[in-house]
């Protein structure tokens, strides 16, 4: 049975049991601040469990893309090393929202595994929750009794809170669970060791394949548990492990889920899979990691240095390093796997196939970037290893590890991995200290304390009326206090609200809540777990009395101008650049619009003019808004409505159209009633955001007019300064050409002067052993001149160690130059020396082992630099 057949049989089975089959939610979690990625099938249904939303279907089944590489669920270190951990995996799941409970869930899981998939009954074990005295939770005897109907009692095992009480995080839905394990060992191995002793003991052939979670509780912020109003079933079955069991393989990687990619890598590397453990691990890492990388990018998250973007960059760099070190793949290669994966899963996850070229381009650019520093970084690690060996030490200190991270782009887990391969450890606490210090310097550290919700009225229905009204009378459903950077704020949920919550790139509304003669400012409106949350600094005096909601009309109007303009811009870009253009992100507020889109080259000035012209034509046409709500998603797609990759859409959507033949998008934001209200559209910048992603920033209405006026004023001033020439452009070109000639003459003069200075400094050489030391304090016109002097001396003086303390326009600068042979043979390091010397000028800097520079604030410290350098040279030499 192929993996595709196994997946389809699961969905067909639960469809026959009255379940609605729904698509996977995006792997990038945009609606839950507690999660960066979807790490379980239940994430998209969290609000059903909490009672925030009423499910349309009581029974649901799906296959969900999941990622577990951060926080509590972090399997990254094991991925590729063993045969069953993965970064990205599919979770098959069936759900009951206040419908069936333990009896049916247990019976159906047994029926599917034994009657449909034909797994041998004598190879299955189940676990149930044994209870927990500390939590005052009793044993799950219900589950035990239901299991007795299907399986021998000696195969029903008791599990502790760690294994058999499921929690998504520190807060949220939870409950006892019942796991199903399968024993895949040989008959001889089964006879030798009883399988029940290996359950939940990390045996690679005795593994959990299905978990039935019986959601009964909610974990509150104070750690206590409260009963949920309705009982639910949340099951999750690891698709890859299930395939291993059914296809009778010893490893997930031996199934047809992974073999197409492993075979592709093996062929490219010219190495047979199974020939060597190290190369096998590398191939498994690449086959696994490309799945996580591809789906995260396809669902809208690009690699970056922050949060979710950095998680995916870490995974990508881990894969590149394995390919580089163990498979001798020194050029970008990982991106070629995107096509293999996209073809394999086109029938179940079409979003990857439709973005195949874009995803591959992003991966390729990331590979190119990391490969530039990978070789240098690995050489640095080898140098560190040799230094530790000489000292008979085995720990890479935190400061050194942080330098590898900060300078060479090595994630901590990659440093730890390479260290382990060489019998070393990393001072993680020291690394964390360095990281914390950097965050403090960057003022990025922030703390947020959130209290539990206080219920005011028992009402879980929240209605947004802001498409039609900017004023409403509402009641508070619940509120909570939030402390951010020592400042108290409140979050309010109202039964009816005209305030638009920040989502889809559109900023949230501001305004006021009025009760009697008291006005409370609404500072922002956000969405969390599909709740519309109003942020204020105060609470109304009477929490149970109605409040009058009033949206800031001017802000909303300006924001609508910008949002509708992005729709026109999107359509115009497709018209000018091609159908490959897709939105990759946006920001619209009352001041500006920012639009990110897929395109592989800079948009030319001519193309930008065409785009502007089209948008302004559509504004002048004063096209009326055609808004349709509750359109069936399939109907909207047939009509050609543009949907955004990575967004989760329900069965019914809102469709925004400006001219049936021009712009039709799925959108939940607010818009102008007709395009004429936008007034005027002006692009202010076009730039690159990431590989294959461009960004346009623009203004509309009065802001656009002000921008054009300012440009006109600037042009008039330049014309006046140039003495009002007939041809301003020609005059500027002549002036720039003259400047180039003068600059060239100046550079030639400076080069000669630098050589003369270098020649005079040769006479000041001090011998320290076999090292020729030059230490000098100079006044130079530029940092480039300092560099020129240093390189001139390097070319003419052997065994050189040079320290320059230079006054550049009243600012202190330092340079350290060391001959290559001294770096290689004696381990001298200019970067390390510069860090010590820069303290004397209250500055900082860095560079390479042979040349490093620093700038600072304290000009009087240059004499101290020269004095201190003498002591440093004595120590290092």
From Swiss-Prot:
A molecular function (GO) term: zinc ion binding
Cofactor(s), names only, from the UniProt record: Zn(2+)
EC number: 6.1.1.7
Family annotation (Pfam families): DHHA1, tRNA-synt_2c, tRNA_SAD
Disulfide bonds: none
GO CC, alphabetical: cytoplasm
BP terms from Gene Ontology: alanyl-tRNA aminoacylation
Positions with a binding annotation for Zn(2+): 563, 567, 667, 671
Cited InterPro entries: aa-tRNA-synth_II/BPL/LPL, Ala-tRNA-lgiase_IIc, Ala-tRNA-ligase_IIc_anticod-bd, Ala-tRNA-synth_IIc_core, Ala-tRNA-synth_IIc_N, Ala-tRNA_ligase, Ala_tRNA_ligase_euk/bac, DHHA1_dom
Catalysed reaction equations from the record: tRNA(Ala) + L-alanine + ATP = L-alanyl-tRNA(Ala) + AMP + diphosphate
Cofactor binding mode and count: Binds 1 zinc ion per subunit.
Domain of life: Bacteria
UniProtKB keywords: Aminoacyl-tRNA synthetase, ATP-binding, Cytoplasm, Ligase, Metal-binding, Nucleotide-binding, Protein biosynthesis, RNA-binding, tRNA-binding, Zinc
Protein family (similarity comment): Belongs to the class-II aminoacyl-tRNA synthetase family.
PANTHER family: ALANINE--TRNA LIGASE, CYTOPLASMIC, ALANYL-TRNA SYNTHETASE
Record's function text: Catalyzes the attachment of alanine to tRNA(Ala) in a two-step reaction: alanine is first activated by ATP to form Ala-AMP and then transferred to the acceptor end of tRNA(Ala). Also edits incorrectly charged Ser-tRNA(Ala) and Gly-tRNA(Ala) via its editing domain.
Record remark on domains: Consists of three domains; the N-terminal catalytic domain, the editing domain and the C-terminal C-Ala domain. The editing domain removes incorrectly charged amino acids, while the C-Ala domain, along with tRNA(Ala), serves as a bridge to cooperatively bring together the editing and aminoacylation centers thus stimulating deacylation of misacylated tRNAs.
Protein name per its UniProtKB record: Alanine--tRNA ligase
The species this protein was found in: Cytophaga hutchinsonii (strain ATCC 33406 / DSM 1761 / CIP 103989 / NBRC 15051 / NCIMB 9469 / D465)
Organism lineage string: Bacteria, Pseudomonadati, Bacteroidota, Cytophagia, Cytophagales
């Amino acid at each position: 049975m192929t993996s595709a057949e196994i997946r389809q049989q699961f969905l067909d089975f639960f469809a026959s049991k009255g379940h609605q089959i729904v698509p996977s939610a995006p792997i990038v979690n945009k609606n839950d601040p507690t999660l960066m990625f979807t790490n379980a099938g239940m994430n998209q249904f969290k609000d059903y469990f909490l009672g925030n939303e009423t499910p349309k279907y009581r029974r649901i089944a799906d296959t969900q893309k999941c990622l577990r590489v951060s926080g509590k669920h972090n399997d990254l270190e094991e991925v590729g090393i063993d045969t069953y951990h993965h970064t990205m995996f599919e979770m098959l799941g069936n759900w009951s929202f206040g419908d069936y409970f333990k009896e049916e869930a247990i019976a159906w899981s047994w029926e599917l595994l034994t009657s449909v998939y034909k797994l041998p009954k004598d190879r299955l074990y189940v676990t149930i929750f044994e209870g927990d005295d500390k939590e005052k939770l009793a044993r799950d005897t219900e589950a035990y009794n239901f299991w007795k109907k299907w399986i021998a009692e000696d195969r029903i095992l008791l599990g502790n809170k760690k294994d058999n009480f499921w929690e998504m995080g520190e807060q949220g839905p939870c409950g006892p669970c019942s796991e199903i394990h399968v024993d895949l060992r040989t008959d001889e191995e089964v006879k030798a060791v009883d399988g029940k002793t290996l359950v939940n003991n990390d045996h690679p052939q005795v593994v959990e394949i299905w978990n039935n979670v019986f959601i009964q509780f909610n974990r509150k912020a104070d750690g206590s548990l409260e009963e949920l109003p309705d009982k639910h079933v949340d099951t999750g079955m690891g698709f890859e492990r299930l395939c291993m069991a059914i296809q009778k393989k010893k490893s997930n990687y031996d199934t047809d889920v992974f073999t197409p990619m492993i075979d592709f890598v093996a062929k490219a590397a010219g190495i047979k899979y199974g020939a060597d453990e190290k190369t096998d691990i590398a191939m498994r890492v690449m086959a696994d990691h490309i799945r996580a990388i591809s789906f995260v990018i396809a669902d809208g998250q690009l690699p970056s240095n922050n949060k979710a973007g950095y998680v995916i960059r870490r995974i990508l760099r881990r894969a590149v390093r394995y390919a580089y070190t163990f498979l001798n793949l020194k050029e970008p290669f990982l991106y070629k796997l995107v096509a293999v994966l996209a073809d394999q899963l086109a029938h179940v996850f079409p979003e990857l196939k439709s973005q195949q070229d874009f995803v591959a381009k992003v991966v390729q650019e990331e590979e190119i970037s990391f490969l530039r520093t990978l070789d240098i970084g690995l050489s640095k690690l080898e140098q560190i290893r040799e230094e530790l060996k000489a000292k008979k030490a085995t720990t890479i200190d935190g400061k050194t590890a942080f330098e590898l991270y900060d300078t060479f782009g090595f994630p901590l887990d990659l440093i730890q991995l390479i260290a382990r391969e060489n019998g070393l450890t990393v001072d993680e606490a020291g690394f964390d200290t360095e990281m914390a210090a950097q965050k403090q310097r960057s003022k990025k550290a922030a703390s947020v304390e959130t209290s539990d919700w206080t219920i005011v009225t028992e009402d879980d229905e929240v209605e947004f009326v802001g498409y039609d009204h900017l004023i409403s009378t509402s009641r508070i459903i619940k509120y909570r206090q939030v402390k951010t950077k020592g400042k108290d704020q409140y979050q309010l949920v109202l039964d009816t609200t005209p305030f638009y919550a920040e989502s889809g790139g559109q900023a949230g509304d501001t305004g006021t809540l009025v009760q009697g003669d008291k006005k409370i400012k609404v500072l922002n409106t956000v969405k969390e777990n599909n709740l519309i949350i109003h942020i204020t600094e105060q609470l109304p005096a009477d929490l149970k009395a109605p409040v009058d909601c009033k949206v800031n009309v001017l802000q909303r109007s300006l924001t609508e101008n910008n949002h509708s303009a992005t729709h026109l811009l999107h359509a115009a870009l497709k018209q000018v650049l091609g159908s490959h253009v897709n939105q990759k992100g946006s920001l619209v507020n009352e001041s500006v619009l920012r639009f990110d889109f897929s395109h592989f080259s800079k948009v030319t000035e001519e193309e930008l003019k065409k785009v502007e012209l089209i948008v302004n034509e559509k504004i002048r046409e004063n096209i009326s808004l055609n808004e349709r709500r509750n359109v069936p998603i399939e109907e909207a797609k047939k009509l050609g409505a543009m949907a955004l990759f990575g967004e989760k859409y329900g069965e019914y959507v809102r469709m925004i159209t400006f001219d049936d033949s021009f712009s039709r998008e799925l959108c939940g934001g607010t818009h102008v009633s007709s395009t004429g209200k936008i007034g005027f559209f002006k692009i202010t910048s076009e730039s690159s955001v990431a590989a294959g992603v461009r960004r346009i920033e623009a203004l509309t209405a009065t802001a656009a007019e002000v921008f054009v006026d300012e440009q006109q004023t600037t042009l008039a001033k330049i014309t006046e300064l140039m003495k009002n020439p007939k041809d301003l452009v020609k005059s500027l070109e002549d002036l720039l050409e003259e400047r180039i000639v003068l600059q060239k003459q100046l550079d030639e003069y400076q080069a000669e002067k630098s050589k003369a200075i270098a020649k005079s400094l040769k006479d000041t050489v001090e011998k320290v052993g076999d090292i020729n030391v030059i230490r000098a304090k100079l006044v130079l016109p530029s940092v480039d001149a300092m560099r020129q002097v240093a390189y001139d001396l390097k070319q003419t003086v052997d065994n050189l160690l040079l320290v320059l303390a230079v006054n550049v326009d009243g600012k202190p600068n330092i340079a350290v130059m060391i001959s290559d042979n001294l770096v290689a043979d004696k381990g001298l390091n200019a970067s390390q020396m510069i860090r010590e010397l820069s303290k004397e000028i209250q500055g900082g800097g860095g560079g390479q082992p042979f040349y490093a520079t620093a700038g600072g604030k304290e000009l009087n410290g240059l004499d101290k630099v020269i004095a201190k350098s003498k002591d440093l040279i004595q120590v290092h030499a």
